[in-house]
């Protein structure tokens, strides 16, 4: 992991000095994306604090907000690290307000992504980058039921993702996924993401991704929020169909 962080630092230092890349990107991938987000704030009222001249009232009050966008995401593969990590640049061109300037990241087959902390990387960009590692589908990790698990839990966070290959047609894989991200303290949030992935095993690249994430976040007493985010991505251009960095 230190190697990955050092690679990001080195790449950012070169950009800061105005350095021009000595060679073009190894590979350029362009995806279309759609993004929708629904937030619901729920308040449970017991009626205990109602004024004396009113009868106690109990119930549930909800407020909702929605957001959406669409556009393209471009991933440039800059080089491959000795530890198999890929140094990439990712940028988003949205029709609405979610456009994001290029960010330098290192991606691994175990879904780990390390990006420049000073540049915003959107949810839909991360959904793609998590699957961009060269050995994302690793035969050494797949069990007899065509399933594998990635556990990246830490001291305060449980992060477990399960992947299952539902169909393999001449190297074109249909993969279902479930990721549960949970804070381990009593008031932490819980994120559950169900997804489907179309993956070209020959080119080592996802060709389409659909994620449906629900986050439940406790607030103050009798209050919590639910955020549902749906993203879809479809590969529309691959500059290196014959090369698989």
Sequence positions of predicted segments:
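Bacterial N-terminal signal peptides that target proteins for export
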Residues: 1-8
